[in-house]
Amino acid sequence: MAQVNWHLEGEWIKNCNCAYGCPCDFNARPTLGYCKGLVAMHIKKGHFDDIHLDGLKFAAVVEWPGALHEGNGAMQPIIEERASPAQREALFKIFSGKHSADGTLFHILSLIVSRIHDPIFAPIEFSFDMEERTARIRIPGVLESDVEPIKNPVTGAPHRIEVMMPDGFEHRQAEIASATIRSSGAIKFETKASHSSLATVVQTPQGVAG
């Protein structure tokens, strides 16, 4: 399929049930042997062909029975309810991976997710401060997640960890933080003091551009 020109630039949150550092980013197995988590994005600038996506927010709750590369994952996409039908369709086309080069984020997701639950269209509250390592997501009746700095276990002082991934397909640089998650949609789980990555990203059909 011919690739359509698209662009997503904005704030990116990835929270999961793994220990701080997310073993998946190091090609290791998930902390608990399986993965449950979420991604969310506030699109500051975006488009799919001539459809503008500026300002929209989306999220996805995900799970895998083992390591991500082994596949058999499930996903429930969530798009901000104010998105127009054309904008919703544009985002679903991006999520499909059919308009992305091989080995890029959405192409990889299309290979390792075998079940997609019915999408949800709902208000999305999204706050993000990468410097302070704080974030908050609220989707009524579906998802609650808070992010705060990792704390030194002795002094309680904020503990900063920055990860650089020059060849990353999700982001190039991220601040690592501590997440609390309560998911009550099709994929149900709760975590406390688990992994969070906060990043600013630029995704295109050719992958990460910034």
In which residue ranges do the predicted regions lie?
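N-terminal ordered "arm"
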Residues: 2-48
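Residue-level detector of functional hotspots within protein domains
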Residues: 2-4, 8, 25-27, 63, ...
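Short, surface-exposed loop and linker segments with low hydrophobicity and enrichment for Pro/Ser/Thr
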Residues: 25-34, 66-71, 119-138, 176-183
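Short acidic, gly/pro-rich beta-turn/loop elements at beta-sheet edges
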Residues: 28, 49-51, 87, 147-149, ...
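Aromatic- and glycine-enriched beta-alpha-beta binding-site module
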Residues: 33-105
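Low-complexity, flexible helical/coil segments
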Residues: 50-57, 77, 112-118, 163-164, ...
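Charged linear interaction tracts used for macromolecular binding and regulation
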Residues: 73-157
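Extended, charged low-complexity segments
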Residues: 150-210
